Amino acid sequence: MYEVRLSNLAKEDLRRIYYYGAEHFGQQQADHYFYAFFSMFEQIANNPFLYQSVDHIRPGYRRCLCGVDSIYYRIDGNTVDIMAILGSQEPQPWLP
């Protein structure tokens, strides 16, 4: 199993998604969706090569879908770095 690290940008993305969900869908649904991300992080840690490579967006990056959002990550040795969590916006300007 790989270690998972969240970038500061990914942490901010999680906060933004949570607050948006709480405001538009209620706290219970926001909690449910928030915890779904951590379930996906665990799945990524168990098999990070399972998910789609998106070298055309950023070399070395992969993408995993969680609901309507995309988790962008890269593998660094035995660590998975979660770089950003984006909705439908164009990823290039947002990815480090």
Where do the model's predicted regions map?
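Basic/aromatic recognition patch in beta-strand/loop cores that engages polyanionic ligands
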Residues: 49-79
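Basic, Lys/Arg-enriched alpha-helical interface segments
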Residues: 1-57, 61
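Enriched for short, Lys/Arg-rich terminal
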Residues: 69-96
